[in-house]
């Protein structure tokens, strides 16, 4: 909860301190390559909330269609940590040269979990700790809005639903490396 509030305050400060757009008369081109850092929260099932951090690179294949491989590190506690690698496809609903760009995104990938389970034996009541590790598939779909703070720097809140995790809410901070000039 504190992480989410700190993140919101940080994004607000950046938005207020950064000039919003360059000169209005300047013609922008569509983005070609973007990189972003991802911060947020994910929920597995009904109550297993994880904090997440990661990164992604988006490459445009047409004016509005792009592919985006991403990596996320998710952590609930020292006894529950996940690594997620997913290939996404994104579509910009609005003109990608504008200040606000609404998009849909979805993809599939793999999630690897490592953790520890502790308890006591049912019969002997002897305590035990077991290391666990498993890999499973993941899929998610959702949408977001890129808000350009400058010609190239943007923030984008994003919400996704899926399998492993069930719900994912993130704030992305990104930069356009090719295009928008």
For each feature predicted by the language model, list its residue ranges.
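Repeated loop/turn-to-beta-strand initiation elements of outer-membrane beta-barrel proteins
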Residues: 33, 63-69, 97-99, 147-155, ...
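Transmembrane beta-barrel outer-membrane domains
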Residues: 28-30, 46-50, 78-84, 132-138, ...
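Cleavable N-terminal export/targeting peptides
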Residues: 1-29, 179-181
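Subset of outer-membrane beta-barrel
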Residues: 43-47, 51, 96, 116, ...
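Gram-negative (and chloroplast) outer-membrane scaffold detector with strong preference
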Residues: 58-123, 136, 163, 172-173, ...
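Extracellular loop and loop/strand-boundary signature of outer-membrane beta-barrel proteins
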Residues: 40-43, 74-76, 126-131, 158-159
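Gram-negative and organellar
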Residues: 24-27, 121-126
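Short glycine/proline- and aromatic-enriched beta-strand/turn motifs that initiate or cap beta-hairpins
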Residues: 22-61, 67, 73, 108, ...
């Amino acid at each position: 909860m504190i992480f989410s509030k700190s993140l919101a305050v940080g994004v607000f400060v950046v938005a207020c301190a950064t000039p919003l757009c360059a000169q209005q008369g300047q013609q922008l081109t569509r983005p070609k390559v973007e990189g972003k850092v991802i911060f947020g929260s994910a929920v597995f099932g009904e109550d297993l909330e994880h904090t997440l951090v990661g990164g992604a690179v988006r490459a445009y294949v047409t004016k509005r269609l792009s592919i985006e491989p991403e990596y996320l590190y998710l952590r609930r506690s020292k006894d529950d940590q996940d690594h997620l690698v997913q290939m996404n496809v994104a579509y910009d609903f609005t003109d990608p040269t504008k200040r606000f760009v609404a998009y849909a995104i979805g993809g599939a990938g793999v999630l690897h979990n490592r953790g520890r389970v502790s308890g006591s034996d049912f019969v002997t009541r002897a305590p035990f700790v077991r290391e666990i590790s498993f890999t499973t598939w993941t899929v998610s779909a959702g949408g977001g809005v890129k808000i350009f703070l400058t010609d190239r720097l943007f923030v984008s809140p994003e919400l996704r639903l899926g399998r492993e995790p069930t719900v994912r809410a993130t704030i992305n901070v990104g930069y356009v490396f090719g295009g928008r000039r």
